[in-house]
Every structure is written in C-alpha cells, then in structure tokens.
Amino acid sequence: MCIRDSFQDEYKFGASADLGFNSEFKLNSKLTMNVFFLNGEGYKNVQDNDGNIRQGVSFFYDLPKGFETRIYFDSHDAKDASAITNSSFFLGYKADGGRLGLEYNKLNNARNYKSSEDGYNRDGFSIYGSKKLPKNYELFVRYDQISSNILSGESNAWNYNNDGSLLMFGTQYQATKGVKFNINYRLFNHDNSVINNKSILSLNAEFKI
C-alpha cells in the first residue's frame, strides 16, 4: 500500500531519497548490513557549503515465522553545532493475509534533517498494518505519535504546535497489475488544544508502468 509518506519522510527526520554511496554486506543467511555515505540534503538539494555528508549504518535481521527487524543510525556533521543524529528501530511481521509494523524514530540536535540546532530533539513511533480481503481489496490502518523535547526555561515543548498524533485508515483496491485506488481518512490530533485538529478524506490513484 502507498497511502502516505513513511514516518521519517512525513516528519522530516530524513530525505525520501538521496545521492551517495551505499554498500550492502550479507553477514550470514539472516543478517544484512548496509553502510552508506550520502549528500545529506536529499537528491533535490546541492551539497552544503561545508561539504559535510551523512554517514551511517543499518542492520536488517530476518527473524523466524515471518518476523523481521531493522536497526538504523546516521550522523551528519554541522557547522558550529553538534552533529545531527537520526536513529530508528523497526519490527515487522508479514504473512500471506497481511502485514504489521512498529517503528520508533529519534532525531537529535535538529529541527529537521537539514536544520541543525543543539539540544532540539524529536522522537516518535508509528504502528501500521494491512489485511488482504477477497476480490483484490485491502484494509489498512496507521497510528503515529510525534513529540519534541522541552528546552530549559520553557513550559512547553519547542515544537508544541506541531506535536501530536495521526490516525489514518481506509481501503485499497487493485484494479489490475500496476493500478491501485484507495480511499482513506486522516485525523491529526494536536497536543496544543488551541489548534483545531485536521481531518481529511481523500481518494488516491496509483499507476505503475
């Protein structure tokens, strides 16, 4: 299913795609390691003036009985500030009838992956799943929680107006190979009760050639 950006993309913990070097090592039949050196600003942006790159490592382990796990860490040096670090942990389950996933993400010393700021941290988790139905239908649901830390001398988190939770659910229909339609409902519930919560009902189409 393709109904929304990943947690990392949605909350700008990392770029959806980037330019650089990635090498994969098969350590054994169950464990794979990736080592990468990337531009750090995403493929749409040029290298920063200081020439700093994003470097990191990830481990993917294939657990028994349809379970899998992934640990990820990267670091991006910044001028006149501590390095931006981004880490995540994923646990998933996949079977013929559906999928489940749970991930936790943490971004340190940054407002987002391109904007360094000492002591500004964000973290959150995402739970999602899908269930296949007869006649090429599929149900899906997702819940996110995103938060930021409280800085010294402040009473609220530094990103309080954008902290909160996202609930999304809907159904998807695969008309033929490469053609999918889905309808979904999204509700973002702000931690700041003064801000009106945002809800959207949308219909999407996906075409792959």
Located regions from the model:
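Outer-membrane beta-barrel pore domains
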Residues: 61-209
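Surface-exposed coil loops of outer-membrane beta-barrel proteins
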Residues: 4-61, 203-206
